[in-house]
């Protein structure tokens, strides 16, 4: 939306994500050990036991961006970050698709709230009760394995027609046609050219409705509860004409 509506960063948005198809995401993870520059750290569930994000965070070494939540975990890397997420396939059958996405979303909420030490607040009292019983019974490691299995359950599916935001905040928004992400076009973003889906209009309407309508000033908030920030050697950095 930033690229289309603002031709760059959304002024009040403090977050930037990169999304990939599952096959590209898995390949990305496979080349990280040999290709990642020394000034970056790839934070995953595998290399930091206290980190349970379902996606990968690329963090800048010798910087700090501590939020209200992550400040509770001093042993994890809390550098300035960029999130890298996969878009996963789901069933072509409408009923099975609904079950898969509901189960995936539920497993993610269980992991999140188990990690945070908070109660699950579901759509109904009964659902909340069941979820919190599961949260108390099962260890975090087990819940995380279930979550990861559900996220990529259909990764080897033949002729998939639907994708969903398996790792991101739109996991409960439902599936969308996989063909929307088949092709990319290059658009202006600040002083650079970056790729976005050719069917960006359909994708953005699926996410936001009338995405060209500006939200009220009163609703323009950052998405992170930042407690402390240190840009390190980048404190005096000025953006160049191109990336």
Tell what function each PLM region has.
Residues 1-16, 20-29, 33, 179, ...:
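Active-site nucleotide-donor binding segment shared across nucleotidyl transfer reactions
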Residues 29-92, 112-209, 214-243:
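Conserved catalytic core of two-metal-ion nucleotidyltransferases
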Residues 94-99:
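A short secondary-structure junction signal
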Residues 102:
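Short, His- and charge-rich active-site/binding loops that engage polyanionic ligands
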Residues 108-110:
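Mobile amphipathic helical/loop "lid" adjacent to a hydrophobic cofactor/ligand pocket
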């Amino acid at each position: 939306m930033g690229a289309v509506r603002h031709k760059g960063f959304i002024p009040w948005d403090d977050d930037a994500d990169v999304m990939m198809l599952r096959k590209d995401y898995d390949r990305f993870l496979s080349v990280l050990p040999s290709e990642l520059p020394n000034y970056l750290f790839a934070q995953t569930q595998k290399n930091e036991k206290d980190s349970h994000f379902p996606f990968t965070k690329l963090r800048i070494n010798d910087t700090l961006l501590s939020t209200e939540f992550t400040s509770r975990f001093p042993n994890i890397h809390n550098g300035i970050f960029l999130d890298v997420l996969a878009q996963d396939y789901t069933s072509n059958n409408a009923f099975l698709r609904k079950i898969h996405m509901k189960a995936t979303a539920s497993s993610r909420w269980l992991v999140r709230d188990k990690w945070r030490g908070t109660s699950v607040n579901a759509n109904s009292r009964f659902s909340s009760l069941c979820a919190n019983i599961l949260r108390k019974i099962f260890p975090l490691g087990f819940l995380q394995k279930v979550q990861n299995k559900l996220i990529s359950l259909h990764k080897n599916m033949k002729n998939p027609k639907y994708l969903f935001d398996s790792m991101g905040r739109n996991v409960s928004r439902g599936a969308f046609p996989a063909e929307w992400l088949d092709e990319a076009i290059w658009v202006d973003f600040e002083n650079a050219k970056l790729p976005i889906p050719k069917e960006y209009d359909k994708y953005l309407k699926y996410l936001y409705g009338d995405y060209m309508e500006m939200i009220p000033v009163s609703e323009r908030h950052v998405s992170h509860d930042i407690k402390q920030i240190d840009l390190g050697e980048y404190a005096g950095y000025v953006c160049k004409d191109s990336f």
